[in-house]
A protein has these predicted regions:
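Outer-membrane beta-barrel proteins
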Residues: 1-157
Length: 157
């Protein structure tokens, strides 16, 4: 649970709470809701978020759905995302994910995909991800599309 009182930097209070349940082996589900009034009552946003992950053997699957309902006209957003991860060996894991954001105001949905892999050897992990994002912020312009490559190297001591 979270509460942000109004003050000199906040016009209105914000309150959020969430619940997570993991009573079934390998399954975790959760729900969170809240009201963000930090920008003032006229632009208050009600947020809802539900998610689930399930791990069975070397496969983990996840799903998430968010909804933001704003008092500002045509500012609502809905998000859905899914991911699957496969642990090939103790050292190697691969993943694939996809997500979509539906903007109430825009005719185009933002769509993203991600492909990643990580390799761990001792205390060192090498990882790489390729992300594609189409129609960022609901724009149909070609400049609103992105390909992103990330490489990571981490050490644990």
């Amino acid at each position: 649970a979270s509460y942000t009182p109004s003050g000199s930097a906040e016009v209105l209070s914000s309150t959020e709470f969430g619940v997570t349940y993991s009573g079934v082996d390998g399954l975790t589900v959760g729900y969170a809701t809240g009201t963000d009034g930090g920008a003032g009552a006229a632009s208050e946003v009600d947020n809802r978020n539900a998610w689930a992950t399930y791990a069975y053997g070397s496969v983990t699957v996840g799903y998430q759905s968010n909804s933001s309902d704003s008092k500002v006209a045509s500012a609502d957003k809905d998000y859905t995302g899914m991911v699957i991860t496969y642990t090939v060996t103790d050292e190697l894991a691969v993943s694939y994910g996809t997500s979509e954001i539906d903007y109430e105001l825009n005719a185009f949905d933002q769509e993203s995909t991600s492909v990643g892999a990580s390799y761990t050897m001792g205390s060192m992990t090498l990882s790489g991800v390729h992300n594609t994002h189409d129609n960022i912020s609901g724009s149909s312009l070609a400049s609103a599309d992105r390909n992103v490559y990330e490489l990571g190297l981490s050490f644990a001591f």
